Amino acid sequence: MKKKIGLYWFTFDLRLHDNSLLVDASSFLDELVCLYCRPSVTPFLHHFAQEVTLGRARQKFIDASLCELNDALGQLGQRLWTLDLPPYQALKYAIQYLSVTHLYSDAMAGSDEQSILHKLQDEYPHLVIVQHSVRSLFDESKLPFTLPDLPETFTQFRKCVEGIDIAHPIDAPSRLPPMPKGAQLPTLSSFYFDESALFSGGEWSGLAHCRRYFFSGLASSYKETRNGLDGMAYSTKFSPWLALGCVSPRMIHAMLKQYEQTQGANDSTYWIYFELLWREYFYWYARCYQQRLFRFGGIRNQPPLTSFYAHRFQQWKNGTTPYPIVNACMHQLNHTGYMSNRGRQLVASCLVHELGLDWRYGAAYFETQLIDYDVGSNWGNWQYLAGVGADPRGSRQFNLEKQTQMYDPNHEFIERWQGRDSRAQQDVVDMVGWPITTQQENGDK
C-alpha cells in the first residue's frame, strides 16, 4: 500500500494547540514534513510600500515565533523546514522531492495563497489538498450565510453570528508522524533573541501573555482604556500572536469566558469579544472579496479622489508631516512594529485626507512594518477608513487637532516619540515628485 506522505504548510497558524488540521494530519499520515516559507516583499508590495524588505521588528517577531514552533515540533520528533523561495516554488520543490501525496493548509484569507493552491492542484492532479480554517472563531459550515452573501457591514455580521456557539479549543496533538527517511531540507538558522523587543513571538509567549492579561484584571476596564496611544496596559495586545496564529481566537474566547465566570462580565469584557468579532468579520471579508481587497476602488469599485505624491508619502512614512500626533505614531511604528488602534485610524485618515494619497500605499507600508499584520484586518480596515470598503457612511476623516486634545492633551506621547521633530521634512521635490536630498541640492558634491 502506498505511503501517505503529508506536507503541512505553516503560514499564519504557527502553533500546535487548537490546530485541528494538524491533529487530522497526525492521525492519518504515515510520514509528515512541516514547511514554512518566509514572507518577502512582492513586486506589488514593493510598488506601494516603497520598501525592499520587511521591517526589522516584524521579521524579528516572525523569527521568534518560528523558533518556538520548531522547539514544540522537536518535542514530538519533528522539525520545521524553511525555504527562502517564493511559496509556489518551495511547495513544488518539496512535493516533487518528497513524493508528497497530501498537502495540508489553513484556509487562508489571502488571494495569493489560494491562487498557489489552485496552481498546485492543476499541476499535480494526484495531490490531495486538505484545507480548513484554524484561524477563525466560526467554522464556515456554521455561518448563517454563504460566503458570497457575507453581510455588507460589520453590524449586520455581528447580529448574524453573536448567537452561534463557539467551539472550545482542542489540545495539541500528542504525537506526530515521523519525517520521511533521508529527507534533507533547510532548517531554521540560529536566532538572536532581541531582549529590547516590545513583544516576543511564539506560541508559548503568546499564551503566557494572554494568561497574564486576564490574571491582571485589566479586562474589566478594557472599554475605558482601549483608546490609549502608548504602553502595554491600555489594550489587550493579543493581535501580534493572533496575526501569526501563535494563539487561536477560540483560545482567547475560552479564556475570556472563564474570566467572566470568575470575575464577572461587564461592558469591557463584552468589548473584548466585540473586537474578536471585528477581526473575524475581516477574515471572512478577505475570503469573500479576494483580489478586490487590493483594488483602488475597493469592493464597490468606486475610486476615491486621491492620488500619489512621492514626497508626501515619504514624509508620512518617516514621521515628518506637519502633524505631530501622526509623526509620533509613525515613529512608534517604525521603531517597535506596533501602533495603537487609535493611532492607526489617525495616520490613515491623515494619509487619505490631509495628504490626499492613494490608501493602498499606506496599507502596503503597514504590511511591511506591523508585527500584527493580518491581510483581512489590515487591508479591510484601510478600505473602511478610505471609504471604499464596509463602512456604510463612506470615508472617515478625523480632526487631528481635536484627537490630540482628547487622547494626548499633555503631549506626553508626542514628546516621547518626537512628534514635533520634523527636521528631515522635505518640501522640495524633483521633476518626478521625489524629495530632493541635501546632497542633491548641493549638486551631489
Swiss-Prot record:
Gene3D superfamilies registered for this protein in UniProt: 1.25.40.80, DNA Cyclobutane Dipyrimidine Photolyase, subunit A, domain 3, HUPs
Pfam families cross-referenced by the UniProt entry: DNA_photolyase, FAD_binding_7
The keyword Flavoprotein is annotated on this UniProt entry: yes
Domain Photolyase/cryptochrome alpha/beta per the UniProt entry, residue ranges: 4-137
PANTHER family: CRYPTOCHROME (PTHR11455), CRYPTOCHROME DASH (PTHR11455:SF22)
Function: May have a photoreceptor function. Binds DNA; probably functions as a transcriptional repressor.
Keywords linked to the UniProt accession: Chromophore, DNA-binding, FAD, Flavoprotein, Repressor, Transcription, Transcription regulation
Protein name: Cryptochrome DASH
Annotated gene: cry
Organism: Vibrio parahaemolyticus serotype O3:K6 (strain RIMD 2210633)
InterPro entries tied to this protein: Cry_DASH, Crypto/Photolyase_FAD-like_sf, Crypto/Photolyase_N_sf, Cryptochr/Photolyase_FAD-bd, Cryptochrome/DNA_photolyase_1, DNA_photolyase_N, Rossmann-like_a/b/a_fold
Family: Belongs to the DNA photolyase class-1 family.
Domain of life: Bacteria
Molecular function as annotated in GO: DNA binding; DNA photolyase activity; FAD binding
Example GO BP: photoreactive repair
Keyword DNA-binding listed: yes
Cofactor: FAD; (6R)-5,10-methylene-5,6,7,8-tetrahydrofolate
Cofactor note: Binds 1 FAD per subunit. Binds 1 5,10-methenyltetrahydrofolate (MTHF) per subunit.
